[in-house]
Amino acid sequence: MNIVTSNRIFLSQVPDKLASDEPFIFWDTCALLNLVRIPLIERKELTLNMLQSYEFLLNEIEMGHVQSIASEVVLSEFSHHVDNIINQLHNQEQRIKDEVKSQTAYMANAQQANVISQKIEFLDVSNKVIKMVRKIWQKTYILRGQKSFATNADYRTRNYITPSRGKESYKDSYIWVSFISLLNKLQPTEICYFFTANPADFAVDKKTTTLHPDLATEMPA
């Protein structure tokens, strides 16, 4: 996937480029990848209700009601994984189309079977989610990497500090450090969202959305 981004900013540019009195969403990689994964049948935990939530978010971003921000690491991770997911979507879609056409061939009404076979060609949820994620990236500010992010993330990883507790997870730490650095620089007065689909790393446990207390203490007052 060719990802178009035009809003790349350094931390020092944050006060000039972003509004402190407007809400923003800061994306974790898995949250964006899961949008593309929604049509995959084997991902039973991803539902069409989730697609509606992403549609709502995209609309809020496009209307200028919510600022969209991601770390440079998130962009890199997303780019590394998304093409494989898209290939899975296309393969699954073709299998479904072939199966439906095969089933309709046994229908008594040949004309009706032909109509259904033609309509199935327009059932393309895969293209819908791909278009949506492209639009999100087009409207997203990319927070460029810098040495302080890397140094902090390395320290957290080596000392197993959340979100690297119990494992070496440099990228998760880097993304979190980027988010906290952004908050400290912008000093927002409106609500801010850290959107992750990986609560096992950032929440109390994988069954809750409550921020891990180690991370909660780092949030600006």
Protein language model regions, located:
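Active-site-proximal, substrate-binding regions of enzyme catalytic domains
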Residues: N2-C192, A200-A221
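Cofactor-binding loop segments of dinucleotide-utilizing enzymes, especially the Rossmann-like FAD-
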Residues: A197
